[in-house]
Regions:
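Active-site Tyr-X1-5-Lys
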Residues: 115-118, 134-171, 202
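NAD(P)H-binding glycine-rich loop region in Rossmannoid oxidoreductase-like domains
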Residues: 40-79
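Glycine/proline-rich active-site loop of Rossmann-fold NAD(P)-dependent oxidoreductases
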Residues: 144, 167, 179-195, 222-223, ...
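C-terminal substrate-binding subdomain of Rossmann-fold SDR/epimerase-dehydratase oxidoreductases
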Residues: 205, 210-213, 218-301
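N-terminal Rossmann-fold NAD(P) dinucleotide-binding loop
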Residues: 2-3
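Rossmann-fold cofactor-recognition segment
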Residues: 30-42
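A conserved pocket-lining segment of Rossmann-fold NAD(P)-dependent short-chain dehydrogenase/reductase
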Residues: 69-70, 130-134, 161, 166, ...
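Conserved Rossmann-fold NAD(P)-dependent oxidoreductase catalytic core, especially the SDR/UDP-sugar
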Residues: 85-138
């Protein structure tokens, strides 16, 4: 998402300061005012950014995803919650220094949901933002914590301090579904079975799908995801009725992915070998999400 977002912001004439774990490719780096290789858990780096730049808008994309997070949950918490706290603090310090609210865009995830059973999922219909908030993964717990931290920094930060800056942050978050990109191969997410199937077929490789054929969760394409993030960023604050929004595009089953892949790549070799752990995670996520609030408040479509 970061590369596509840099492309979109650069195309709109916005100066971008980027931070990634690794050096950016030259073509992406050329679209940034500055770029740093570093870690959001490195407070010295964030202090340096605070000293060097006046920041009006932050897109906080860094995260350790759901599958990887279950192998190292404590590390996931350090990155996903500790890192988010660090970047929120940077935003608040920017607001205090420059006397202007900092807009903070936080990509959350359907992993923040936790339906109690497959039967509950099958009968839930389109799930709204405030339902089933008991995630089954550390990543989901972390995303839920990030949403609440953002709400706190926007409305209640340093509530008892005499020198507090009221409402330093304009926090806006989207609970993204699974995201499909034609540009990058996914890694580390539990919704990756769909895009992995597509990329494997395009490369002529066999693919073992780790969920059942009837498994269904929401997905969207990467261009749709970036469009949603930018639409929310540009929405007038007075129109927003909440800090966290669902967005949806389509909800195919894993069997639908296989059927469409075979239409494009007739010789694709796809088998279904469900992994019980990852299957249980995906079964705890909604089959469909209600995005009525996004459509009403900021014209998502």
């Amino acid at each position: 998402m970061g590369h596509g977002l840099i492309e979109a912001l650069h195309g709109a004439g916005r100066p971008v300061v980027a931070v990634d774990l690794r050096e950016l490719e030259a073509g992406v780096r050329a679209k940034c005012r500055s770029a740093y290789a570093g870690n959001i858990c490195d407070t010295a780096l964030l202090d340096r950014l605070h000293a060097q730049y006046e920041v009006g808008e932050i897109y906080h994309l860094a995260a350790l995803l759901s599958t990887r997070g279950e192998f190292a949950p404590e590390t996931a918490h350090q990155v996903n919650v500790g890192g988010t706290l660090n970047v929120l603090h940077l935003a608040a310090e920017q607001a205090r220094s420059h006397g202007q609210r900092v807009k903070f865009l936080f990509p959350s995830s359907i992993a923040a949901y936790g339906l109690p059973s497959l039967d509950a999922k099958n009968h839930a219909g389109k799930v709204a933002e405030d339902c089933y908030s008991h995630p089954h993964t550390m990543y989901g717990v972390n995303k839920l914590a990030g949403e609440e931290l953002g709400r706190y920094y926007e409305s209640h930060y340093r509530k008892l301090a005499r020198d507090r800056t009221p409402h330093p942050i304009d926090f806006r978050s989207i609970r993204f579904p699974g995201i499909i990109s034609s540009e990058t191969t996914p890694s580390g997410g539990t919704s990756d079975y769909g895009p992995e199937m597509i990329h494997a077929a395009a490369q002529g490789k066999p693919y073992e799908c780790f969920v059942r054929p009837d498994t269904r969760i929401p997905f969207m394409t990467m261009p749709e995801a970036i469009d949603a993030l930018l639409r929310l960023a540009q929405a007038p604050k007075e129109r927003l009725t909440r800090t966290v929004y669902n967005v949806s595009s389509f909800s195919p089953s894993a069997a639908d992915f296989e059927r469409l892949v075979r239409q494009a790549y007739p010789h694709a070799a796809v088998t279904f070998v469900p992994d019980l752990g990852r299957q249980a995670i995906v079964d705890s996520w909604p089959a469909e999400c209600c995005d009525r609030a996004a459509r009403t408040d900021w014209d998502w479509k």
